[in-house]
Amino acid sequence: MRPAVEADGAVGAGVDPARAPTVPIRPLRFRELLDEPFALIQAHIRALAALGACVLVLAVAVVLAVTGVVSHLTDGSDAGTAWAVVLATAVCLWSLRLVLRGATVAMALADFEGVGLGAGAALRRAAKHAGPLLLAQVMFSLTGIGVLVVGSLLIITYPLALIWLAHVRARRFVTEPVIIGEHAEFGAAVARSKHLVDGANWTIGGLWLTQRVIFTVLAVPLFGIPFYLSDFSGTHRWAVITLLVSGLLLVVTVSEIVEATSRAICYIDRRCAREGMDIRVPGDSR
């Protein structure tokens, strides 16, 4: 069995925490896997809100700056402005997810140690594993695009593609927690994730699909915020661009924080189920 605690950031039984973890270290039922991420988020709401707000504001500012430059260079061309918005938003969205996923996982894993990390400390801990996390995000994106493109060749096969994607996502669901918690490189982390998830592929796949439904429901009120503000800002081009980009990135920010927290919780759950990490051995000094 692997040691329950690593030198910098891993988690497990045998730790004498300064405070009890927000989520109990034991195997969890499906309902708990859905509910506990929100409990963990609530326990660190200030740090996560600060992290999300800073990343969101920076991403929106970059999109608007790039769009403004392109619009100026193309003399306000509608096509040029539209492409600038789409491409800049896509790049910032991808980068936002990378940063939030790493920092949120680091913060969640620290909670299991009884440590409360602030936004800055979580970013620094994630930055130590920037290479593997970046590679994991690249493969995450390519896998999703590949599966959905193949599945969408025929409209009737699209639901099957979503199920296939859920299975693929489940096998790699705890890759980022392994990278941060066990200081693993990308290849070793993927193999470790598949080992931990083995036997619970469809449970975690179902969790992933259920979260897509939850995120869709959450998107309605979140998108309502910029549309409400449009009553005051008007419908000028830049006001509309700002509100639409802000609304989209806000939805992604909230969704990514929830999903990243779920990844950390599933990592602990699977280590308990597969390795008995929640079992204390008398006289064990780990």
Q: How would you describe each model-predicted region?
A:
Residues M1-R286:
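Hydrophobic alpha-helical membrane segments
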